């Protein structure tokens, strides 16, 4: 089946969904492609219950709720979703691009917005003997239902945002949390680190710094303890039912890497004015985009979506100038 639209957006994470809204506000029709069966990207697939603290007007919002609200915001513009399929082939035809998906869907558009986050993703697993025996029962790389960790003794490994944020969140329901990190300094947001250290003073979280994961001990997929080791090879046994290793994601751009885009370390290089790639009419926004001074924040991706689509307006509408209007005016006219 062949479709024709104004904009194709690759990725249905928060930035991709906000791009749908921005395009709609500018009168552009959108088709969206995502490899997952449901919309939401990493927010839904990896951490639907994870609290997000840096969305304006929301002191705290769960990832799944953010996706729900973004979907509702985009819905009036009637986007067409092509889920459970990947964008695998790109062809340029006169003023149009043609994308072919893994389900042989063909979509023609004048503009492409790549908001694919980390691309295809999977966890970086710690090199522990027999860890696969515990996966899915005692060892988890993603959390989609934190209630199952209530009353548990949990080892969280890592020093970034995911490790610190989950330690804070799970401390409300867990019996005990050990946060294992090879250094005393954490790379999470400073305010999150401040909260972490405050909770650690109460004893709900124990900071096990200067140590790394060394071994797992248990029977029949039931974890009983986690062995950690410091730089002097001194070991310590942590009594725990659950291990949550948060060492980031493996990234793979898949077929996007073959589209002639400038790619560096699994990211797409863009200009930092309008986030256009080296191919005119193709933009990259959100975590997949790279430029000097890039901040990997959801709100940064929102701004990139707005800028790129305002810039793309003249291409979609054959050189027509865009006269800026505030959303209250535009939405009022739509109603």
UniProtKB/Swiss-Prot annotation:
Classification via InterPro entries: FAD/NAD-bd_sf (IPR036188), FAD/NAD-binding_dom (IPR023753), Fd--NADP_Rdtase_type_2 (IPR022890), Ferredoxin-NADP_redctase_2 (IPR050097)
Cofactor note: Binds 1 FAD per subunit.
Cofactor names: FAD
Positions bound to FAD: 34, 42, 47, 87, 121, 287, 328
Family, per entry: Belongs to the ferredoxin--NADP reductase type 2 family.
Catalytic activity as recorded in UniProt: 2 reduced [2Fe-2S]-[ferredoxin] + NADP(+) + H(+) = 2 oxidized [2Fe-2S]-[ferredoxin] + NADPH
Organism: Rickettsia felis (strain ATCC VR-1525 / URRWXCal2)
Xref: HAMAP family: FENR2
Protein name: Ferredoxin--NADP reductase
Cell membrane listed as a keyword: no
Sample GO molecular function, one term: NADP binding
Record keywords: FAD, Flavoprotein, NADP, Oxidoreductase
Major enzyme class: oxidoreductase
SUBUNIT field: Homodimer.
EC number: 1.18.1.2
Cross-referenced PANTHER family: THIOREDOXIN REDUCTASE 1-RELATED-RELATED
Entry keyword annotation includes Ubl conjugation: no
